Amino acid sequence: MCDEEVAALVVDNGSGMCKAGFAGDDAPRAVFPSIVGRPRHQGVMVGMGQKDSYVGDEAQSKRGILTLKYPIEHGIVTNWDDMEKIWHHTFYNELRVAPEEHPVLLTEAPLNPKANREKMTQIMFETFNTPAMYVAIQAVLSLYASGRTTGIVLDSGDGVSHTVPIYEGYALPHAILRLDLAGRDLTDYLMKILTERGYSFTTTAEREIVRDIKEKLCYVALDFEQEMATAASSSSLEKSYELPDGQVITIGNERFRCPEALFQPSFLGMEANGIHETTYNSIMKCDVDIRKDLYANTVLSGGTTMYPGIADRMQKEITRLAPSTMKIKIIAPPERKYSVWIGGSILASLSTFQQMWISKQEYDESGPSIVHRKCF
């Protein structure tokens, strides 16, 4: 690692999108869907030199003839063959680098099973022959990106949400809470409530259209009941959206009913607590002496925290739950969609981090379990 010229690669594998690029950059070079698609029917497209699988944007653009699979479910890798395809695509097609020439920083979900970290480590060294690698917890990287080492991160992506209290740079595992409610569930819920309005969206391809509607038009209401009343009495909240075939649909209270499920999971038929209660419960699992620091440094991260109005609503809900004298601050950086990646870029380019890498030599001596000793 003495040769300073070699940039480390930073790869943040999310359930919905993969973010990849070079350490020291301020944004990922490549952002593409974590999707592997396989043809539904053999040889429909004659002379297309049909491949047996497509990854990312190419899978997305050919989605009409493919069956789409997400190898990462709820933040955890469940299909390693497809995951390998995604990494291969990341290195060779997106970043156009030789992985055997660069250290690689990967990210993992909080509470990721030990066997999974070992498998990631094994694939990096044995399949891609990387000279060095490291596995970092996503939420911790988001906190670094906000310039902090202590705080609680609400990280909500496409497949899973976590509340992760972090003290002096270390995640506190006993207080981490996971909520299996995230972007994909909200997309499904929006499909359902749009169907109630008379618009039908059913296929995996149509789900992507609904995801786009969600990202462009949804917002979080500060007061849900009041917003519902406003929507019922006037058309001021209605917006129109043009579908790919040119048909225009109108959406009203669905705009805020969809993300309201984050605060009221009962909308989805789930018995779980909302993101505000989960954050509060996570703080309450921590030592009484550090709670003040967590309340004052509540950091939002991930694509599902991108809804307009979400920070104000969190502030209101947590103020309600916390002791009345407590200072509560919700930090919602504008780049929070990519803050895990940005934190990884910062970490991998620190001079003090260079001795933290797991080297190929250490891996050869100790095997995959080295990851538990060096990454925490």
UniProtKB/Swiss-Prot annotation:
It is found in: Cytoplasm, Cytoskeleton. Gene3D superfamilies: 3.30.420.40, Actin, Chain A, domain 4. The modification N-acetylaspartate is found at D3. One of its GO terms (cellular component) is cytoplasm. One of its GO terms (molecular function) is ATP binding. The modification N6-methyllysine is found at K85. SUPFAM superfamilies: Actin-like ATPase domain. Pfam families: Actin. The modification Tele-methylhistidine is found at H74. This is Actin, cytoplasmic A3.
